[in-house]
Amino acid sequence: ATFTFGVKENNYLGKGLGVEANATINEESFKGLFSVNNPNYNNSDKSLYTIFKATETDRLSNFGYKSNLIGLELGTKFQYLKQFNFGLSGRSFYEDIQTDSSASDKQKKQSGSYWDTFTSVSFDLDKRNQKFKTTEVYRSSFTSDLPIITKTNTFTNKYVYNYYSELYENNITNFSLYLKSARSLTNDDIKLSERLYIPGRRLRGFESGKIGPKDGSDFIGGNYITSLNFSTTLPQILENSQNVDFLLFLDAANV
């Protein structure tokens, strides 16, 4: 079983600050996040944000390894040109990986402590007619994480494209493409925490984290992921209901 809980405030203390805290817990892992975002820092029309993150993955009993990661990210985002946003951030993480005699050779090689620092740049072209219930045009974004201080020199890229259309009255149709890669610039094996999994909302109906390459019977994620998603609302079903929405979707993905 997985339990998720969190709180989010968009106008903390009446100062316009965005504050969010959430946690996800299951029998093998804990993921926690706390973030503060100032969307108009010093009246500059630039957002300034801080993210604190902590995770623990405990698979000692089943696969012979355990990982603890804690880190901090500082960044900014702003509109560089009309409908074009630019982001820049730096983040550092400390990770400790422990293994025992039952771990695979791949995991034993990664045992130890790591200090990793990355710089991230993002480009976001947002042509949507509105952020909520978008019915027209598209949004295209690209993010790249550049290794600064790492043992594995993992270089990560992500591209997301969303196209929206209103095929008929009150309908919202969306097509989405999601591409992500993580590979070592020095041809090292990247860490388990850096490997990629299909996000659950991009492959609905499957157990999250249970798709893709295995190390023995352990799902360890991949270096490349792709997903195609299509969805369309069906407003003609219970069209007088304000609380119920019907959605037809098709998801396809590869790890």
Question: How does the language model describe each region?
Answer:
Residues 28, 57, 95, 204, ...:
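A short acidic, often aromatic-flanked loop/helix-cap motif at beta-alpha or helix-coil junctions
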Residues 1, 102-244, 248-252:
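C-terminal outer-membrane beta-barrel translocator/porin domains of Gram-negative envelope proteins
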Residues 3-11, 30-43, 48-50, 68-80, ...:
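Feature captures outer-membrane beta-barrel proteins of Gram-negative bacteria and organelles
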Residues 1-2, 21-32, 58-67, 146-155, ...:
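Solvent-exposed loop/turn segments connecting transmembrane beta-strands
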Residues 32-111:
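Transmembrane beta-barrel wall of Gram-negative outer-membrane proteins
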Residues 11-19, 41-48, 80-87, 129-132, ...:
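Repeated loop/turn-to-beta-strand initiation elements of outer-membrane beta-barrel proteins
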Residues 6-10, 22-26, 35-39, 51-57, ...:
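Outer-membrane beta-barrel pore domains and translocons
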